[in-house]
Amino acid sequence: MIEYVRGELAELSPATAVIDCNGVGYAANISLNTYSAIQGKKNCKLYIYEAIREDAYVLYGFADKQEREIFLLLISVSGIGGNTARMILSALSPAELVNVISTENANLLKTVKGIGLKTAQRVIVDLKDKIKTMGATVAGGSASAGMLLQSASVEVQEEAVAALTMLGFAAAPSQKVVLAILKEEPDAPVEKVIKLALKRL
């Protein structure tokens, strides 16, 4: 079992990271929160969850143990798989998600793509008691937008559309939504564009 991977950050997109460990590249699916945390770093450490199925072996990477713990709680809920859990953690920071579950805010949770009202309610019912112990741990929230690297709008557009297609959305509607967001907020960093797009697609 892989607990974590530490090494050179060889490749990074809003949806995946490749860590070079002594010449071996480990590709891991990541959330936007982890992307924000490791963006711009030469070396990094990702805590790993291994999803092993008959037809696939997939790694999910997290910048800290708290995000991984919340991910594991999410996938313990019936109907929530790895990609859906990652999408939830891309739309909401761990601190925001803890707050949503603690306050039973199903309406906010169902704004995440792929989460209907029934699934949102199931997440809250199943995790409310389990998540209470994590509230203080993740209260620190996510990285401030001011610390994120700024990119030209075209580059942001390309990265955002690429990330959305990797998450399973069709390219054409993704492009349309991303362009609309950049028209409203030309200086928005890529992770903000993707978060907004996830709520509109």
From Swiss-Prot:
Any Pfam family matching the protein: RuvA_N
This protein's UniProt keywords: Cytoplasm, DNA damage, DNA recombination, DNA repair, DNA-binding
Signal peptide feature range: none
Domain II: annotated span: 64-142
Localization of this protein: Cytoplasm
Subunit note: Homotetramer. Forms an RuvA(8)-RuvB(12)-Holliday junction (HJ) complex. HJ DNA is sandwiched between 2 RuvA tetramers; dsDNA enters through RuvA and exits via RuvB. An RuvB hexamer assembles on each DNA strand where it exits the tetramer. Each RuvB hexamer is contacted by two RuvA subunits (via domain III) on 2 adjacent RuvB subunits; this complex drives branch migration. In the full resolvosome a probable DNA-RuvA(4)-RuvB(12)-RuvC(2) complex forms which resolves the HJ.
Descriptive protein name: Holliday junction branch migration complex subunit RuvA
Organism: Bacteroides thetaiotaomicron (strain ATCC 29148 / DSM 2079 / JCM 5827 / CCUG 10774 / NCTC 10582 / VPI-5482 / E50)
